Amino acid sequence: MTGRMTVALERGRVRLLLMFGLERQALARILRRLEAHPADAFSLATGAHLHASLGDPAAAQRMLERLVRLHPERADGWFNLGYVCESLGLLAASEAAFRRAIAIDPRLDRAWYGLSLSLIAQQRLDEALQTLRKNTELQPMSPYGWYQMARVQVDRQEPDEAEKIILHLRGFEPRVAAQLERETGLGAVRA
């Protein structure tokens, strides 16, 4: 059997284990694969995901740091590292990872969104607003960026701007608009 066939077979086994919800067994296979092939990007990314989903974000962080050290060109690796660092409260590291992902792939809307969350957590609202604008430009029909943008506008003491966003959301995500109205007292609730 060729090396490529062996890799494909092993990845298939991992996917099969995951389909049946056997995450720990899948992680054990991934870790064995990494012993033999320590730079395998698929195994590093999958292992990090499994560590995170099994409740060990610190192990996920270590694996993702290894991934981006070995494969610095992977925007997805940097994005995932940013996400894990944010979940651990490592906001400077999270911000740096999201910025690196954006530098590699400026159209990676999730990285713009993740960066905005890191900036919001650091109370850097003006910068967060700019990143949310970029996120909503890339994903205009996703409510997440719009929701956060409205919250930032409220925190910036700009209720009229937040109401404009709520009105915009009513056009394609009325439940999210209603949620914002309840949370902020703006929009139809205030009228």
Language-model region placement:
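Structural marker of alpha-solenoid helical repeat scaffolds
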Residues: A36, L70, I104, L138, ...
